[in-house]
Amino acid sequence: MGMSPLTVKKLGFIFMIVSASALSVSFAGRPSIFVHKKINLREEMVERSMHEHERLLRMNTKDYGNNSPSPRLERPPFKLIPN
């Protein structure tokens, strides 16, 4: 009672379709735990503003000291030379 190669291919294809659909259904479960996590907006805003303030302090060096390189090429601000 041997099975023909065509029957084996058909059964394999049907098994592949069923297993792929079962896998996709299993991934479509409930939302992630991060959706239900309560976010404290006040702490997040304070943290974000502290980060922005630090970034602005590093960026606003108007002298010829060490500063982070500018993303565009521009001349440094002119400093008067005392006579």
Curated annotation (Swiss-Prot):
One of its GO terms (biological process) is Casparian strip assembly. The keyword Acetylation does not apply. The modification Hydroxyproline is found at residues 69, 71. GO terms for cellular component: Casparian strip. Disruption phenotype: No detectable phenotype in cif1-1. The double mutant cif1-1 cif2-1 is defective in ion homeostasis in the xylem due to defect in endodermal barrier formation in the roots. Highly sensitive to excess iron. Retarded growth under low-potassium conditions. Repeatedly interrupted, discontinuous Casparian strip due to patch-like localization of the CASPs proteins. Reduced rosette leaf size. GO terms for molecular function: hormone activity. The keyword Signal applies. Induction: Induced by excess iron and further synergistically regulated by lowering the medium pH. Residues 59-83 are annotated as: Disordered. Residues 1-22 form the signal peptide. Expressed exclusively in the root stele. Interacts with the specific receptor kinases GSO1 and GSO2. This is Protein CASPARIAN STRIP INTEGRITY FACTOR 1.
